[in-house]
Amino acid sequence: MPFSSTHNKHKLKFSAEEEFPDLSKHNNHMAKVLTPELYKRLRDKETPSGFTLDDVIQTGVDNPGHPFIMTVGCVAGDEESYEVFKDLFDPVIQDRHGGYKPTDKHRTDLNHENLKGGDDLDPKYVLSSRVRTGRSIKGYSLPPHCSRGERRAVEKLSVEALNSLEGEFKGRYYPLKAMTEQEQQQLIDDHFLFDKPVSPLLLASGMARDWPDARGIWHNDNKTFLVWVNEEDHLRVISMEKGGNMKEVFRRFCVGLKKIEEIFKKAGHPFMWTEHLGYILTCPSNLGTGLRGGVHVKLPKLSQHPKFEEILHRLRLQKRGTGGVDTAAVGAVFDISNADRLGFSEVEQVQMVVDGVKLMVEMEKKLEQNQPIDDMIPAQK
């Protein structure tokens, strides 16, 4: 759990060798990059708000790795973290985002009309579609580092902004503190609300401090546009609905997101963004678009096929279990989404999901008729 910088000065009484974490059993991006030399060079640095190298790496020290997913193992505490600790973050980002270089520039495209197709995914196989992203509000520390006052200020700003939305986006805010245990669980089960802070990644990085203070969910009246406030990021914006109309989900996502961004800009609080990293978020894995376009899709035959993993890899897609990142697939229903966040625009990422899922559903239908799919396996995208 992050400490104040005074604690960091206390640690400096010990040599870098004495303080260097034991990463011998670790399988995460941070552990691959952090050497005793790098630790020594960066450990006395801190951002203007007092975030230190030990704060950056603590979650990766406490969580050696994940059996299915190579975790990142480090977080940012504020916008400046990516600059002050760039000697650690840059190689992690390059590793995690397919060779994205420190000199590369990220591109943004939130024009939903540039998406081709996406309104014809077969609802017999595609059960639900959703697109999400994160946003950070300039001038405030990020969740691993923010104070109670900062967190409450972020909530106040966000609620004022969201409550001014109209039309299809008109909705209301539900603070976590005011919910009963049952209401909370129901929203989690319906995939509307973030889970309780049991994830070791959340706990070790300090994001769960003061829980549930200043956390909540805002959604429009028909629950197709949601905003989580103060979980892993200041804001998580989600557009979702049942069935396979990804085109409509993406339209609502882009339109709603632009409206929110406008309101924040007018209030003098733009979102954190840089030309190199795109939208700045807490976890380096989400930099760039922060976008995850995903569908819940039923693939009983294809998921048993020996080339299933390779097909996903070639389509630049990632699979998760039905309930999210740490869960198993129930009834052969997988959560399939884009693997990339940085270096591709929002439209390009959703296009990969639409095209890839369409192809996989066609493969599933072929396998149902006991026909081979070898000639359908795509080249690497």
UniProtKB/Swiss-Prot annotation:
Main subcellular location of this protein, as a coarse class: cytoplasm
Coiled coil: none
Reactions that this protein is recorded to catalyse: creatine + ATP = N-phosphocreatine + ADP + H(+)
GO cellular component, one term: cytosol
All residue ranges annotated as the Phosphagen kinase N-terminal domain in the record: 11-98
Enzyme class: transferase
Keyword annotations: ATP-binding, Cytoplasm, Kinase, Nucleotide-binding, Transferase
GO BP terms, alphabetized: phosphocreatine biosynthetic process; response to heat
Residues where ATP binds: 128-132, 191, 236, 292, 320-325, 335
Annotated localization: Cytoplasm
EC number, as in UniProt: 2.7.3.2
PROSITE patterns membership: PHOSPHAGEN_KINASE, PHOSPHAGEN_KINASE_C, PHOSPHAGEN_KINASE_N
Region called Disordered, residue ranges: 99-118
Domain Phosphagen kinase C-terminal, chain residue ranges per copy: 125-367
Tissue note: Predominantly found in skeletal muscle, but not in the heart.
A GO term for molecular function: creatine kinase activity
InterPro entries: ATP-guanido_PTrfase, ATP-guanido_PTrfase_AS, ATP-guanido_PTrfase_cat, ATP-guanido_PTrfase_N, ATP-guanido_PTrfase_N_sf, Gln_synth/guanido_kin_cat_dom
Function: Reversibly catalyzes the transfer of phosphate between ATP and various phosphogens (e.g. creatine phosphate). Creatine kinase isoenzymes play a central role in energy transduction in tissues with large, fluctuating energy demands, such as skeletal muscle, heart, brain and spermatozoa.
Known partners and oligomeric status: Dimer of identical or non-identical chains, which can be either B (brain type) or M (muscle type). With MM being the major form in skeletal muscle and myocardium, MB existing in myocardium, and BB existing in many tissues, especially brain.
Family to which the UniProt record says this protein belongs: Belongs to the ATP:guanido phosphotransferase family.
Name of this chain's protein: Creatine kinase M-type
Species assigned in the record: Gallus gallus
